[in-house]
């Protein structure tokens, strides 16, 4: 086996070296300037130990259980910003508890936000009249499916929303939204 001597190895020319240096510099600057742009489009996430997203009120502040329960009574269903920024209903159960599930407020027919109508104890879609019972199960179309569910957890007085992957307790079937 023979070794190559330095005279046998072709050297890098000045032009090739400058091209390589220029390419490396431009690539480094481009990647460095791209980082804040990508970071801008990824929303900040406050998460609990269960991997959920912090529920936000209409002003974008994190929801605390004590503050929520002080302003909402038993049976109340009010909107917070949940998973992916979707409007999600928090349910107050009793005088001192937030329900273990939330209801996504997006109608399964055409995507309208469905308001809670406490007078008839239903969610009634203003767009085409779909109706859902107090748990979000569709009771009158044209909506084809029940409203999606989300897990709600309270940790250290902070309210977290996470993806519902269990069986849908309203239908006994696998959730359609997972």
Swiss-Prot record:
It is found in: Cellular thylakoid membrane. Binds 1 [2Fe-2S] cluster per subunit. Residues 68-161 form the Rieske domain. Coiled coil: none annotated. One of its GO terms (molecular function) is plastoquinol--plastocyanin reductase activity. Keywords: 2Fe-2S, Disulfide bond, Electron transport, Iron, Iron-sulfur, Membrane, Metal-binding, Thylakoid, Translocase, Transmembrane, Transmembrane helix, Transport. GO terms for biological process: photosynthesis. This is Cytochrome b6-f complex iron-sulfur subunit. It comes from Prochlorococcus marinus (strain MIT 9313). The lineage of its organism: Bacteria, Bacillati, Cyanobacteriota, Cyanophyceae, Synechococcales. The gene is petC.
């Amino acid at each position: 086996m023979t070794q190559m001597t330095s005279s046998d190895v072709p050297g890098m020319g000045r032009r090739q070296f400058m091209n390589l240096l220029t390419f490396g510099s431009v690539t480094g600057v481009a990647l460095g300037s791209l980082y804040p742009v990508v970071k801008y489009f990824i929303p900040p996430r406050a998460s609990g130990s269960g991997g959920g997203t912090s529920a936000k009120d209409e002003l974008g502040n994190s929801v605390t259980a004590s503050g929520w329960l002080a302003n909402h009574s038993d049976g109340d269903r009010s909107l917070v910003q949940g998973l992916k920024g979707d409007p999600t209903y928090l349910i107050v159960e009793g005088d001192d508890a937030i329900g273990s599930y939330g209801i996504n407020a997006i109608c399964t027919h055409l995507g309208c936000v469905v308001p809670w109508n406490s007078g008839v104890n239903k969610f009634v879609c203003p767009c085409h009249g779909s109706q859902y019972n107090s748990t979000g199960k569709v009771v009158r179309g044209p909506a084809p499916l029940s409203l999606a569910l989300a897990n709600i957890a309270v940790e250290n007085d902070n309210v977290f929303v996470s993806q519902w992957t269990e069986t849908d307790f309203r239908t006994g079937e696998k959730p359609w939204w997972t």
